[in-house]
């Protein structure tokens, strides 16, 4: 008979252990430090644009671009927080509203959130959008004030249409007392190509580009946060340089560096280690990469998943150690589509999907010459095969493909 483990004191035992962390929260993306390193130029540029709000004037709308982890959100929130502080000191009504468009990704939800921020009772569903917009305008136009709306990851919002941006960009013509300005933040330099020209013109009155951090700058940021996050003497000598080096390879991504520093500590703490060492950083890098791949793969469209699964099947059966060609991949892709009754795309479109997987870092595609047979792309996987396969097969539409390899490969490699 197996004796059940008593749960008495389960968490007390864990809490009794000495934590290597002083304040883990300072390593999370949601934390904005009192001093932002290596972003003075960007802070001053944004402050120069927004200072007109403190004179009761409407600041220009701003678009901020830069790759992930270049400080866009941190700078925008930092400047916004300072703007609100100074406006209080000067007895000027100035509100900064932060919206994450990855979460609030529809016109209705955006307007409802804005209205609720100004204490209007608006349900999260059910009303006509025009009515919600009217409520928002009524709420803000009750007094003289300047409102700055920060739309982080704005490109996620316009995937469902730019009507709301058009309406917000013209809102000042309907207001008597309040003034509204917008700041759009995006990782995608090309997202404005999908905007109505009128929206593009009014939204992009000013543009700021955030360059990537270099390894030395990332190291400075990590040292600043490490002092707040960890107890003295906990970090090994090579931990911060290694985190900075890994992140510098990822286009100077400070967010990735901070994640590495945090996850390294979590791994060490779970193993009851008194110090965070280089080996913990390397394991954290592997874990974060797997987690990133899992999340990206999980959110791929069905057709992209089928393209990726085709490559995995070829890689696992008969092609191990060899790169896969686009022709071989398309052959398997067609059979997978037949098997689960999905529309078959043209080879050109499938090649486009494969190029998107390349851009996401999931595959690596290289054009090679086959002499008189022309040119083709050779594809190799850049992600852990088994983890990726498991994530793909979580999709109910792909579940029938679990045992499919035999029927495909008997035909192709007999």
From Swiss-Prot:
UniProt-listed SMART domains: AAA (SM00382), Cdc6_C (SM01074)
GO biological process, one term: DNA replication
CDD domains associated with the record: AAA, Cdc6_C
Keywords per UniProt: ATP-binding, DNA replication, Nucleotide-binding
Pfam families with a match to the protein in the record: AAA_22, Cdc6_C, Cdc6_lid
UniProt binding sites for ATP: 70-74, 213, 225
Entry superkingdom: Archaea
A single MF term (Gene Ontology): ATP binding
NCBIfam families in alphabetical order: orc1/cdc6 family replication initiation protein, PRK00411.1-3
UniProt family annotation: Belongs to the CDC6/cdc18 family.
UniProt function note: Involved in regulation of DNA replication.
Protein name: ORC1-type DNA replication protein 1
Organism: Methanosarcina mazei (strain ATCC BAA-159 / DSM 3647 / Goe1 / Go1 / JCM 11833 / OCM 88)
């Amino acid at each position: 008979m197996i004796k059940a483990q008593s749960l008495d004191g389960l968490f007390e035992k864990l809490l009794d252990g000495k934590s290597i962390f002083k304040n883990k929260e300072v390593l999370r993306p949601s934390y904005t430090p009192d001093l932002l390193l290596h972003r003075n130029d960007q802070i001053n540029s944004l402050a120069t644009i927004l200072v007109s709000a403190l004179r009761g004037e409407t600041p220009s709308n701003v678009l901020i671009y830069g790759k992930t982890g270049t400080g866009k959100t941190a700078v925008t929130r930092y400047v916004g927080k300072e703007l609100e502080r100074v406006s209080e000191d000067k007895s000027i009504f100035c509100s900064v509203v932060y919206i994450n468009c990855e979460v609030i990704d529809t016109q209705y939800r955006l307007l409802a959130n804005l209205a609720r921020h100004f204490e209007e009772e608006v349900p999260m569903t059910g009303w006509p959008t025009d009515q919600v917009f009217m409520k928002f305008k009524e709420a803000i136009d009750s007094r003289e004030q300047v409102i700055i709306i920060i739309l982080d990851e704005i490109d996620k919002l316009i995937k469902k249409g730019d009507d709301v941006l058009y309406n917000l960009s013209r809102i000042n013509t309907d207001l008597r007392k309040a003034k509204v300005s917008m700041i759009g933040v995006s990782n995608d330099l090309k997202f404005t190509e999908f905007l109505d020209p009128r929206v593009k013109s009014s939204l992009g009155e000013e543009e700021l580009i955030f360059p990537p951090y270099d390894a030395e700058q990332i190291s400075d940021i990590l040292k600043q946060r490490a002092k707040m996050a960890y107890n003295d003497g906990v970090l090994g000598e090579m931990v911060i340089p290694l985190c900075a080096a890994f992140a510098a390879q990822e286009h100077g991504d400070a967010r990735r560096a901070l994640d590495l520093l945090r996850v390294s500590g979590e791994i060490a703490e779970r193993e009851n280690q008194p110090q965070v060492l280089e080996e913990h950083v390397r394991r954290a890098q592997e874990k974060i990469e797997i987690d990133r791949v899992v999340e990206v793969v999980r959110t791929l469209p069905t057709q992209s998943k089928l393209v990726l699964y085709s490559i995995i099947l070829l890689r696992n059966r008969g092609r191990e150690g060899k790169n896969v060609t686009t022709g071989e991949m398309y052959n398997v892709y067609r059979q997978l589509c037949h098997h689960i009754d999905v529309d078959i795309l043209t080879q050109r479109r499938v090649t486009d999907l494969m190029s998107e997987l390349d851009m996401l870092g999931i595959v690596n595609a290289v054009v090679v010459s086959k002499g008189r047979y022309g040119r083709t792309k050779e594809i190799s996987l850049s992600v852990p095969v088994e983890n990726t396969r498991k994530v793909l097969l979580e999709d109910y539409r792909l579940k029938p493909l679990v045992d499919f390899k035999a029927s495909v490969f008997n035909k192709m490699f007999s």
